[in-house]
């Protein structure tokens, strides 16, 4: 398991070099699951470079998000899991100043290394990812916030316990 974790960390760190050429931002997140386990996520985002409903209140925009999450297991690490996810995310930014509060929401897909995460049985490795977050955009290069993410297979296969992750995140534009 340590070799797998080392490989995942090395891959995530090398993602930064690749992503700097093509991605608009790199995101790191640390969170806890609904089962009290820890999660660690690294992701890359590509801004849509479009906005809708622009007004003095703010604007609607969005980005594509791809990420890798390490789901910490028991103390022996034998129950640790990994997941890859991809989602379109809509963002509403309030205001036009240096600090812009925002809310975000998205629904995407994910694939897990196992159907069990802690005590939760997801029923299948393929799951949907629903997210809701809020935070502050700092200038044009940084975002910090909190995010709740729910994973389940939408009843495609039973059991479908689902699992949630609640995380603090930081994003930096490249």
Protein language model annotation of sequence segments:
Residues 28-32, 64-70, 103-109, 146-150:
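Transmembrane beta-barrel strands of outer-membrane/channel proteins
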Residues 32, 46-48, 92-94, 136-138, ...:
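Residue-level signature of outer-membrane beta-barrel architecture
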Residues 41-44, 162-174:
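Outer-membrane beta-barrel "beta-signal"
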Residues 42-44, 88-90, 132-134, 168:
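Membrane-embedded beta-strands of outer-membrane beta-barrel proteins
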Residues 34-36, 80-83, 124-127, 160-162:
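Short sequence motifs at beta-strands and strand-loop junctions characteristic
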Residues 29-30, 74-76, 117-120, 153-157:
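Extracellular loop and loop/strand-boundary signature of outer-membrane beta-barrel proteins
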Residues 1-23:
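Cleavable N-terminal export/targeting peptides
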Residues 20-24, 49-60, 95-101, 141:
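Short loop/turn motifs that connect adjacent beta-strands in outer-membrane beta-barrel proteins
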